[in-house]
Amino acid sequence: MLSEQQYRYIVRILGTDIPGDLKVPYGLALVKGIGVNLAYALCRLLGIDPNKRIGFLTDAEIEKIEKAMANPLAIGIPVWMLNRRKDYETGKDLHLVGADLIYYVKRDIEREKRIRSWRGIRHALGLKVRGQRTATTGRIGMTIGVRKGKK
């Protein structure tokens, strides 16, 4: 084990503070846009032990992770693991993390609303978008109790 001085209680990766006591894949999964499967793939391709704690990562390893997430295809991440394939504007395969992901999703929803597609209309009305039933579930607002009638 490394000495106490080399352990960090909080590690900042891709703009997210991660507790140092988590294992690398589960710590990386706290970054918006990275799931556990992608984190395990990153560990395997970058040669980082997945059982290692995030707090024991060196600066070089953290930099490797950040560079890999900037261009995941370059290190061998398969295209199907990316979260934005065939981007609407550029046509490129991208993987977005953090604030970029939030911004692009919000922009996509606004575009759907603007072109008045079915999805956009559902978003605008605050209804379910993906074909779920709405008769009994997904009700919003205060619940009103049923009052018992007089006997």
From Swiss-Prot:
Gene: rps13
Quaternary structure, from the entry: Part of the 30S ribosomal subunit. Forms a loose heterodimer with protein S19. Forms two bridges to the 50S subunit in the 70S ribosome.
Transmembrane segments: none
Function: Located at the top of the head of the 30S subunit, it contacts several helices of the 16S rRNA. In the 70S ribosome it contacts the 23S rRNA (bridge B1a) and protein L5 of the 50S subunit (bridge B1b), connecting the 2 subunits; these bridges are implicated in subunit movement.
Pfam families the record matches: Ribosomal_S13
Tagged with keyword RNA-binding: yes
Protein name: Small ribosomal subunit protein uS13
A single cellular component GO annotation: small ribosomal subunit
HAMAP family: Ribosomal_uS13
Family of the protein in this entry: Belongs to the universal ribosomal protein uS13 family.
Record's signal peptide: none
GO biological process, one term: translation
Keyword presence, Translocase: no
Keywords, ordered alphabetically: Ribonucleoprotein, Ribosomal protein, RNA-binding, rRNA-binding
One MF term in the entry's GO annotations: structural constituent of ribosome
